[in-house]
Amino acid sequence: MNLYEHQSSYNPNMPVRGLIYFAELYSGYIQKNKLDVYSTKQINLPVPRYIIFYNGTKNEPEKKELRLSECFKYSAQQSDELEQKEMKPCLELTATMLNINIGNNEELMKK
C-alpha cells in the first residue's frame, strides 16, 4: 500500500498524518476484502510505503527519514522508568522524505 504526498513546506508531523491516512486506508482494505480481524487466523495486509516529495525553501537533505516515535513525549514517571530500562514505543511509522528541488535526487527526477 503506497502513500505519496507532495509538500511545499517542511512538516515534522507527516508521520502522524501518515498514521491517520494508513489507519483509514487499512480499514477500507479490510472491509473491501471482508477480512476478519477477530479470527484466530492471521490476516495478510499489503506492506505500507510512505513517500513524501519535498520542494520547499528550507534546506533539507536529499533523503530524510521522519519517524512517528520522534513525536512521542514521555511523562516524568516514564522518564524515570526510561532511565531504569530502555522503553520503546509499541508503534512506529517511517515516512521517507525525498527532496525534489533542483540539484537534488537527480536520478529520480530523470524518471
Regions found by a protein language model. Give the residues of each.
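Conserved single-residue anchors adjacent to enzymatic active/cofactor-binding motifs
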Residues: M1-K111
